[in-house]
């Protein structure tokens, strides 16, 4: 028989930087999970990632206080900011431009994010990336 799931916990943790301090420690501790076990496992799995890359993680919590976790790809905004070489998006998207991304960069981001997006074709994934870029105040060229 499968373990009984008692809940899910979604966190965004920098790659290789999981530690028991807030926000990770309190979020796991109040659910009775072993904080250090998660930190060691997460850091081991994110060793190959670039340091401080934000990694969304979904932790499945079971009734016996054990857990499993699934890592997603970094947020689209992270990839867009890297491609445009900016620190943050525009405060007034649509009016002020924060930077530019090319169609090739959009395609590359769509290919990286494809497994986490709810679409079938690369073209629809590219449209999602372009929409995110526009909402950040980035112009898509090409």
From Swiss-Prot:
GO cellular component, one term: cytosolic large ribosomal subunit
Keywords: Methylation, Ribonucleoprotein, Ribosomal protein, RNA-binding, rRNA-binding
Metal-binding recorded as keyword: no
Superkingdom of this protein's organism: Bacteria
InterPro entries: Ribosomal_uL11, Ribosomal_uL11_bac-typ, Ribosomal_uL11_C, Ribosomal_uL11_C_sf, Ribosomal_uL11_CS, Ribosomal_uL11_N, Ribosomal_uL11_N_sf
Gene Ontology MF annotations: large ribosomal subunit rRNA binding; structural constituent of ribosome
Role description: Forms part of the ribosomal stalk which helps the ribosome interact with GTP-bound translation factors.
Subunit description: Part of the ribosomal stalk of the 50S ribosomal subunit. Interacts with L10 and the large rRNA to form the base of the stalk. L10 forms an elongated spine to which L12 dimers bind in a sequential fashion forming a multimeric L10(L12)X complex.
Protein name (record): Large ribosomal subunit protein uL11
Organism per entry: Rhodopseudomonas palustris (strain HaA2)
Gene name, Swiss-Prot/TrEMBL: rplK
């Amino acid at each position: 028989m499968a373990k009984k799931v008692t809940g899910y916990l979604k966190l965004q943790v920098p790659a290789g930087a999981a530690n028991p301090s807030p926000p990770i420690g309190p979020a796991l501790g109040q659910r009775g999970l072993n904080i250090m076990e998660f930190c060691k496992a997460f850091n081991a799995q994110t060793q190959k990632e670039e340091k401080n890359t934000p990694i969304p993680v979904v932790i499945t919590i079971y009734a016996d206080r054990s857990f499993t976790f699934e890592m997603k790809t970094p947020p689209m905004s992270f990839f867009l900011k890297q491609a445009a070489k900016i620190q943050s998006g525009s405060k007034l998207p649509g009016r002020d431009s924060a930077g530019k991304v090319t169609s090739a960069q959009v395609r590359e981001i769509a290919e990286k994010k494809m497994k986490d997006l709810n679409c079938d074709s690369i073209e629809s994934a590219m449209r999602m990336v372009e929409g995110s870029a526009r909402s950040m105040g980035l112009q898509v060229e090409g």
